[in-house]
Amino acid sequence: MSRDITKDIYGDLNYAPITLFGNKLNVGIIGAGRGALIKTRNFYNKGSNIEVLALEFLDDFYELDTNRVKLIKGCYKTQFIKNKHIIIIAVSESELINKIKLDCENHHKIYINSAKFNEGMGVIPVSRESKYISAAINTKVGNPRGAVLVANLITEYIFELDEFIKLSGEIRNNLKFEEKTKDSLLKFINSKDFKFFYDKNKIINVLKLFYDDN
């Protein structure tokens, strides 16, 4: 009898998506290997304040702005997590990982376990951005390279939609209708039909249908 072994391996991964403002985050990263560097750069590029704790650092860490990335040489102590919003566990020693996890749970910290992602509280998605759109991609089978593939495939489409999203956002922010008409118009300007008229350069004519004759 066949069965879906992915359920045994990954369990039921029920993501609860939330988008945080990177420049308001204090992030603690424990470990300074290649994986830690990748995650440091990810938060660095989003403007986060970062502290990295390790006994040794890759040379690449020293290329980052020291005003935003503080490198701390030393062993882990509970005090390290107390002023952080998110903790990245990027070490391989099981005993240390369990100690950090317990501290994070006791202090209500969001933590990511790089060694075994499903034993943490979440994962860092693959993100792609245009000027007006931000997208984050996860897989539900622990396949980060697969997430990169999907993100790359949709990137071109994101850029194609960029100016359309800008326009629909500007219209939304300048609507002066009563609530019922406004709601109806908002549904329309964020529909495939409206995108069709946008592509045909007929937006002005269509929008006039929502105004009085004057």
Task: Provide a role label for each language-model segment.
Residues 74-78:
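Conserved SAM/SAH-binding loop
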Residues 47-51, 84-94, 133-142:
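Short beta-strand and adjoining strand-loop segment in the mid-core
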Residues 15-44, 52, 167-182, 190-193:
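Glycine-rich adenosine-cofactor-binding loop
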Residues 86-91, 97-123:
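ADP-ribose/adenylate-binding Rossmann-like module
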Residues 139-214:
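An accessory alpha-helical subdomain
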Residues 3-22, 125:
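A short, basic/flexible loop-to-alpha-helix module at the beginning of a structural domain
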Residues 38, 46-63:
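NAD(P)-binding Rossmann-fold cofactor-contacting core
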Residues 108, 112-162:
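E1/E1-like adenylate-forming module used to activate ubiquitin-like modifiers
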